[in-house]
UniProtKB/Swiss-Prot annotation:
Residues 80-100 are annotated as: Disordered. It is found in: Nucleus; Chromosome. SUPFAM superfamilies: HMG-box. The gene is Hmgb4. This is High mobility group protein B4. Residues 80-89 have a biased composition (Basic residues). It holds the Pfam family HMG_box. Its main location: nucleus. The lineage of its organism: Eukaryota, Metazoa, Chordata, Craniata, Vertebrata.
Amino acid sequence: MGEKDQLRPKVNVSSYIHFMLNFRNKFKEQQPNTYLGFKEFSRKCSEKWRSISKHEKAKYEALAELDKARYQQEMMNYIGKRRKRRKRDPKAPRKPPSSFLLFSRDHYAMLKQENPDWTVVQVAKAAGKMWSTTDEAEKKPYEQKAALMRAKYFEEQEAYRNQCQGRKGNFLESAKTSLKQ
């Protein structure tokens, strides 16, 4: 595997992680000879997290915000390698939408028209509820269309892979012939 960059800033942690680290230290101080497995400790920690007041949680949220600001500042000054997203080949076929997405596309405009002040998230949640309450007979056309699109995608994907392998083969053959000359 690749080597880790030792100079890369340490990633910021959430308020819950700050709480968990603090809880762990207090637990070790109070019961130094007691060992809890990860599962049991996590369970106790999450129970405690749910039971603490909003005021106490605010302390940890403030710590998380400070940590986030620290991380962002350090990343601005960081010169080393940054993680790069793998670039998608624009010629590669796109994955087809699911039956639910096809349903959502058809009903989005109607939901937005009925509720113009809703956000995209609210419309998506409403579409999800509509989908879950829709009977199988109404879902069937969307599922059939999705299946057709999926089959077409697999065909295109296979053709694309063959084309890519052909390009690699042609490249190797042209390289060999140029070396012979």
